[in-house]
Amino acid sequence: MPTLKTLLLVFDLCGTFVFALSGALAAVRRRLDLFGVLVLAFAAANSGGIVRDLLIGATPPAAIADWRYGAVATVAGLLTFWWAPLIEKLKNPVRMFDAAGLALFAVAGAQKALSFGLDPVMSALLGMLTGIGGGMARDLLLTDIPMVLRADLYAVAALLGAIIVVCGDALGLPMAVVAVLGATACFVLRMLALRRGWQLPTARGARKS
């Protein structure tokens, strides 16, 4: 079985890659240049993890201290810049990659918070924050309303994945199994919400701008 440190690194780097793809592809769609694509890739890939590490006192943040995070984001950005037409053939690629990154980071964030001694409630909330941070940074840099502030199930999916991790830890279940279950639950809920139009309620009588 992998150690907690190894598992966190794997989930962090995988989440970094898929979130970088979502950021880079969103940048390509806005016709940003190569530098802009790489900036969006890095911001989407690492913002959530940097915020997580700063909040729990893991300094310097892993995304800054470990060259692999920047390298993974750069590779994802370059791949997207040169092969965007191939990636666009997937159905809703930005949202699919975003859902995958959301799931991986929510799980990794909750696990790292637990490893730093945070209580279960705060660990679950920090896992959610880790998951939504990259998408928020991407959307804000593109002057979009962040997905997490819209009605669709975004933060809720991240929170579900983080809660599964926290509960699994409390029950003493194998961390690898719990991580996979949490990430899968988050990803499935997010994709189902997109496919079926599941949304949180909005204020009655609110006008669309």
Where are the regions a protein language model picked out?
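Structural signature of hydrophobic alpha-helical transmembrane segments
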Residues: 3-16, 42, 61-75, 119-131
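Small-residue-rich segments of transmembrane alpha-helices in multi-pass membrane proteins
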Residues: 41-49, 98-111, 153-166, 187, ...
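Short, structured motif recognition centered on aromatic/hydrophobic residues
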Residues: 39-43, 50-56, 125, 129, ...
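N-terminal topogenic module of multi-pass integral membrane proteins
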Residues: 1-46, 50-59
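Helix-coil boundary and interhelical linker segments in multi-pass alpha-helical membrane proteins
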Residues: 1-7, 54-64, 108-122, 167-178
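Ordered, amphipathic secondary-structure segments that act as subunit-interaction surfaces
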Residues: 74-112
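C-terminal ends of transmembrane helices
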Residues: 20-30, 53, 78-91, 136-147, ...
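Cytoplasmic-side transmembrane-helix entry/capping segments in multi-pass membrane proteins
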Residues: 35-43, 66-71, 91-102, 124-126, ...
